[in-house]
């Protein structure tokens, strides 16, 4: 039996003691991740991600096919493929801060560091021309924190300076189990079931930093939206070897990912604090958060010394994630 084990480690890009924060590892740190399911991760092995995430036409006997299930059929008899990838990130966000007059005061920076297992994949043969693959990898990540101190005269003169903070964290993980079959020489077909699970939390805090006695009983508002995701989707894929010999290989590939509603359970809570009491409001429901329907097509050429690939992807996301968009007033 041939056993191929691939373990890849990406070194940590940097470490800032002043901004390092504990807690769960994060792979995104951007205000744009506050929408939908967050920032989509580049999937695949390290080699695939190093080439920009190409892999729909990737066909190898020594590397798991993590993007196209049709590639599972390339697994050699009496072999077993196992891949582990470790990723390190130093993520930093910078925001301009302005004073009450609207003039720029300083550049505020914040960052997070993480080291985490990125993907785990195994692939093995079931019969001649028939293979199975199982993989676990991150699908999307949420990580952001933004703050604003409102010192306008009409606010500060009534209740004091008001501080607003928006933050969020979480991720969605993808587990894929599929089968690839080569019914004809150089032509393969694959199907895979995908399970998505994870939790995403969005938080909002509004508080009076310098409460003026007697002017208002309002102190703070704390809100949290938590999404619990657990849903199945599926994928189909094709691969065709136009050229396949000992010197070079030219492969065409395509996949279709069925998206649609994730229908996560969402729990919304609101805590109102004032000088006299604390009120808590909580409600649960089902969100319309969804994944896009996706079509990929590509071609890959490689020989012992050279490899190149080109891919095209079309995603139809719909409007199911628009509920996360919030309208905000002018904060100067």
Language-model features: locations:
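Outer-membrane beta-barrel porins/channels
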Residues: 18-50, 121-332
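N-terminal, post-signal peptide beta-strand-biased segments of exported outer-membrane/organellar beta-barrel
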Residues: 17-138
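Bacterial Sec-dependent N-terminal signal peptides
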Residues: 1-22
């Amino acid at each position: 039996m041939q056993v191929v084990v691939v373990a890849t480690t990406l070194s940590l890009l940097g470490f800032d003691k002043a901004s390092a924060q504990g807690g769960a590892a994060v792979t995104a740190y951007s205000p744009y991740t506050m929408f939908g399911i967050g920032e989509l991760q580049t999937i695949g092995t390290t080699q695939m991600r190093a080439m920009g995430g190409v892999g729909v036409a990737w066909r190898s006997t020594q590397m798991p096919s993590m993007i196209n299930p049709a590639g599972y059929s390339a697994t050699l008899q009496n072999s077993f493929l196992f891949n582990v990838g470790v990723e390190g990130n130093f993520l930093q966000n910078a925001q301009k801060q302005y004073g009450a007059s609207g003039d720029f005061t300083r550049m505020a920076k914040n960052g997070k560091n993480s080291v985490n297992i990125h993907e785990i994949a195994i692939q093995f043969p079931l019969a001649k021309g028939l293979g199975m693959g199982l993989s676990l990898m991150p699908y999307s990540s949420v990580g952001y924190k933004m703050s604003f101190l409102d010192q306008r005269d009409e606010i500060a003169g009534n209740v004091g300076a008001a501080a607003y903070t928006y933050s969020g964290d979480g991720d969605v993980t993808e587990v894929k189990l599929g089968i690839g079959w080569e019914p004809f020489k150089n032509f393969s077909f694959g199907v895979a079931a995908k399970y998505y699970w994870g939790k995403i939390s969005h938080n909002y805090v509004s508080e009076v930093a310098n409460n003026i006695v007697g002017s208002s009983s309002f102190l703070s508002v704390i809100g949290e939206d938590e999404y619990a995701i657990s849903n199945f989707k599926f994928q189909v894929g094709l691969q065709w070897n136009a050229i396949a010999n000992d010197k070079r290989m030219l492969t065409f590939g395509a996949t279709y990912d069925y998206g649609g509603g994730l229908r996560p359970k969402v729990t919304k809570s609101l805590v109102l604090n004032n000088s006299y009491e604390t009120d808590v409001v909580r409600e649960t429901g089902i969100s319309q958060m969804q994944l896009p329907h996706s079509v990929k097509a590509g071609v890959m050429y490689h020989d012992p010394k050279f490899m190149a690939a080109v891919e095209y992807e079309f995603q139809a996301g719909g409007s199911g994630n628009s509920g996360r968009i919030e309208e905000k007033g002018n904060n100067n």
